[in-house]
Swiss-Prot record:
It catalyses: a ubiquinone + NADH + 5 H(+)(in) = a ubiquinol + NAD(+) + 4 H(+)(out). Core subunit of the mitochondrial membrane respiratory chain NADH dehydrogenase (Complex I) which catalyzes electron transfer from NADH through the respiratory chain, using ubiquinone as an electron acceptor. Essential for the catalytic activity and assembly of complex I. Redox-sensitive, critical component of the oxygen-sensing pathway in the pulmonary vasculature which plays a key role in acute pulmonary oxygen-sensing and hypoxic pulmonary vasoconstriction. Plays an important role in carotid body sensing of hypoxia. It is found in: Mitochondrion inner membrane. Its main location: mitochondrion. It comes from the Eukaryota. Keywords: 4Fe-4S, Acetylation, Electron transport, Iron, Iron-sulfur, Membrane, Metal-binding, Methylation, Mitochondrion, Mitochondrion inner membrane, NAD, Oxidoreductase, Respiratory chain, Transit peptide, Translocase, Transport, Ubiquinone. Residues 1-33 form a transit peptide. Dimethylation at Arg-118 by NDUFAF7 takes place after NDUFS2 assembles into the complex I, leading to stabilize the early intermediate complex. Gene3D superfamilies: Cytochrome-c3 Hydrogenase, chain B (1.10.645.10). This is NADH dehydrogenase [ubiquinone] iron-sulfur protein 2, mitochondrial. PROSITE patterns: COMPLEX1_49K. The keyword Metal-binding applies.
Length: 463
């Protein structure tokens, strides 16, 4: 009978399936002998908590997971401290900057110097006045002869001598060639740091030609030791003045090409205008000099205000900026190169004949021809290069308008043949002290533009 009932049930299911639109309903067979038991709800809830028998202390406990989502915490944002250099290619030497950044904004910029310190001022105290001269080539190793000129003027002031006119004109001539060397390096490496490579390659070819002038007049491409106390070491070789004239005539065309690339370039203007602004008051308070001072609108040039050698006999203009930003300083350097070409042309036209050293055997060595015939000349030569010449006791501060600014030498003599003290005032030292002020509030990438516009060389900063 049971099998018959099951068979009838399956027939009913088949009929429901075959009927269109009919849903399948399986018959529910209640289990025999099973009685469902429903407990008391309150009694059952005591087993649903975190503990089986909760007390007052454990009643608020929750079953796991206790913390599906961490509660939000107070976010603490700290400024990042970043080391810029001393291996950075845009550091222009061994500059190390400890910078505090808020995102990419510079909040603090602390320069750390001294990584190129060689004890130059102390070493000079153990050398004669002539032996100390090559140390000045290694200070600002981009504008070599200007450093020599400052030291030579200081020694000549203590000795109370004045070099011959031809020597002074040669000094001014090569001082302006050195200014061209420095400004080419400053402008093109500044552009290279900001991504413009072409000016660097174009103008370094011209720089090599000026190194050739150095080599022809002194035998060395960079560290010349050419300008010495009492005059210059050698006279100009034949044909050199003609070559310098030809170079200066063509170099103005190179400057035109430089300005075509940069002056109205949209990217260059965006990266330099209103970047690193220094007001005239701030420039004076920080002790800026040179282009860093003139770019802020102060017309101060030692070649005009306190002329040395024959700068009072040449005509040139002093370019001055108005905004005090990186762009104004770039324009000042380009215009200074044009004014240097004017001075070079005047030096070539006004170059007088005559001696190139002071006519005093106690200071300048005698000529080779005299040494072969005169015993006194041989003795003077020997004593000059072994003991050196005695400088009367006294002290002097002598400053010149170097390409980077006011380069000063404070020289103290005790009457011996060696300096008692030689303090060197480097323009880049004061400029680097203003880096924090100039870069505060700018982006990290703008710090590179500010370092480039300061024209820093660490030979003179660290000494």
């Amino acid at each position: 009978m049971a099998a018959l009932r099951v068979l009838c049930g399956l027939r009913g299911v088949a009929a429901q399936v075959l009927r269109p639109g009919a849903g399948v309903r399986l018959p529910i067979q209640p289990s025999r002998g099973v009685r469902q038991w429903q407990p008391d709800v309150e009694w059952a809830q005591q087993f649903g908590g975190a503990v089986m028998y909760p007390s007052k202390e454990t009643a608020h406990w929750k079953p796991p997971p206790w913390n599906d989502v961490d509660p939000p915490k107070d976010t603490i944002v700290k400024n990042m401290t970043l080391n810029f250099g001393p291996q950075h290619p845009a550091a222009h030497g061994v500059l190390r900057l400890v910078m505090e950044l808020s995102g990419e904004m510079v909040r603090k910029c602390d320069p750390h110097i001294g990584l190129l310190h060689r004890g130059t001022e102390k070493l000079i105290e153990y050398k004669t006045y002539l032996q100390a001269l090559p140390y000045f080539d290694r200070l600002d190793y981009v504008s070599m002869m200007c450093n020599e000129q400052a030291y030579s003027l200081a020694v000549e002031k203590l000795l109370n001598i004045r070099p011959p006119p031809r020597a002074q004109w040669i000094r001014v001539l090569f001082g302006e060639i050195t200014r061209l060397l420095n400004h080419i390096m400053a402008v093109t490496t500044h552009a290279l740091d900001l991504g413009a490579m072409t000016p660097f390659f174009w103008l370094f070819e011209e720089r090599e030609k000026m190194f050739e002038f150095y080599e022809r007049v002194s035998g060395a491409r960079m560290h010349a030791a050419y300008i010495r106390p009492g005059g210059v070491h050698q006279d100009l070789p034949l044909g050199l003045m003609d070559d310098i004239y030809q170079f200066s005539k063509n170099f103005s065309l190179r400057l035109d090409e430089l300005e075509e690339l940069l002056t109205n370039n949209r990217i260059w203007r965006n990266r330099t205008i209103d970047i690193g602004v220094v007001t005239a008051e701030e420039a004076l308070n920080y002790g800026f000099s040179g282009v860093m001072l003139r770019g802020s609108g102060i017309q101060w040039d030692l070649r005009k205000t306190q002329p040395y050698d024959v700068y009072d006999q040449v005509e040139f203009d002093v370019p001055v900026g108005s905004r005090g930003d990186c762009y104004d300083r770039y324009l000042c350097r380009v215009e200074e190169m044009r004014q240097s070409l004017r001075i070079i042309a005047q030096c070539l036209n006004k170059m007088p004949p005559g001696e190139i050293k002071v006519d005093d055997a106690k200071v300048s060595p005698p000529k080779r021809a005299e040494m072969k015939t005169s015993m006194e000349s041989l003795i003077h030569h020997f004593k000059l290069y072994t003991e050196g010449y005695q400088v009367p006791p006294g002290a002097t501060y002598t400053a010149i308008e170097a390409p980077k600014g006011e380069f000063g030498v404070y020289l103290v003599s005790d009457g011996s043949s060696r300096p008692y003290r030689c303090k060197i005032k480097a323009p880049g030292f004061a400029h680097l002290a203003g880096l924090d002020k100039m870069s505060k509030g700018h982006m990290l990438a703008d710090v590179v533009a500010i370092i480039g516009t300061q024209d820093i060389v660490f030979g003179e900063v660290d000494r």
